[in-house]
Amino acid sequence: MHKCVLDVTVSVGCHSPGTHHKIHRLRNDIKQETVSEKIALFDVLERALEFGQRLGATYVELRGESGFVEYIQMDDSRVNALTQRIERGVAIRVLADGAWGFVSTGDIEGLNTAVESAYKMAKAAAITRREPIQLSEAQAYEDVVKAKIERDPREVPIDEKIKYMTDLTNTIHDYDERITAVTVKIRTASGKKFIATSDGSRIETPILLVWAYPWVSGKDGTRLSAARHEESSTHQGWEYLDTIATPEYIGEQVAKRVILQLEGTPAKGGSFPCILGPRVIGVLAHEALGHLAEADLTVQSAFNGKIGKVVAADGVSMTDDGTIPMNVGTSKYDDEGVPTSRVEIIKDSVLTELMTNREYAHKVGQRLTGNARAESYLYRPIIRMRNTMFERGDRSDEDLFEGIKFGYYCKDFRGGQAQMNASFQVGIQEAFEIVDGELGRPVTDLSISGIATDSLFKIEGISKNEFPWETGRCGKGQEAFIASGGPDIRFAKDGITFGGRS
């Protein structure tokens, strides 16, 4: 298989004046080469498409990418990693005799050779395939999508990025002397993606990412705590970190969670009434339920055979939407050139539709939803979520809390995992007791678990208020930046199981 991951990479273990000079010079070289775009990529893709069709392929899809990627890690004010690289290459998918062949290559001039390799792989795979792959018909689009940004991450000096990270580190340490360690990670990407298919689509879209992530530890006597925070945008440039995800905002958010855990009362284990806040209900929507509605996974999930059936309490709706303006998971087209859309996974308690790509839309007999995504040209597009959420209800905050003698309000999570049978376990990094219908003391060492498909029937109320989105990354053999969320949702006593120290 043809693969070319990096054209240029630099990594450093510390930040010194000499190192900075080398990084700055290399960065200018990378920027110049990226901006110049010496190769007319669409012309090359056109010729390769024609070649693939002459070979006899049923369908040919080429996804070319050219971009600049940067990653920096700082551990307690010391830069321990700095990587910059150009990523330029083409993903080739060929359908022949009812089977896929996939090749990725950085050899742009030798694209025909890679197309032929993908074609031969498809022909070989077809020999043992029981059922031929067929694609749902898709309209062809010719479009150029522009990014409207104020500060291209490529144009921001290294010194300014390191100052941002230093300011964030200092903000966190200054919050409380019990903060013991701070790691800050920054990742940016900027470039273009070109999609060309034998069906006639010719689409150019931007590649854009700014991402900031601190991980913070604290200690008070023998008590330890840790918390994380994540901010990202795929529609704004560095101005997102200048004006929204500032060091002051992020620093206060994550430091507060660490200290609340140090001061919190130990959580009780068992089953209690509870309210899950937007970030926690969002991770359930994505991890414990959303993956079940990805059409390539549904057959082995708890949603198998449930289309058209009641799967939740009255009034519960859950969607995945790739069209929400400025959200992390939003794009105009997916990586097959299909327009993104709003997918009503659960509508008024009924499982209504699945997320699809062209292959599985045909296989399960549902519409194209625009959920085919690939991490980069090194990967084939697969069905991925975008912005996954529970829809708002009609209850006020007072209504949700009323009548809870003792329970928990879970505000933010540290991490979690789920299985295809809908079982889940999530670590909570910010939570409070609910006592006599009022918010009480912060708690520590709390986790939640359950079977999400059972928990859906234990929902007793859904807030009518707007909610913040949680941005994150999802792994499914490859990485995708996503958003998740939902309003405050109340669960009955046996809807969620709590793990704690007492």
Regions found by a protein language model. Give the residues of each.
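N-terminal small-residue-enriched
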Residues: C4-V5, V10-P17, K22-S502
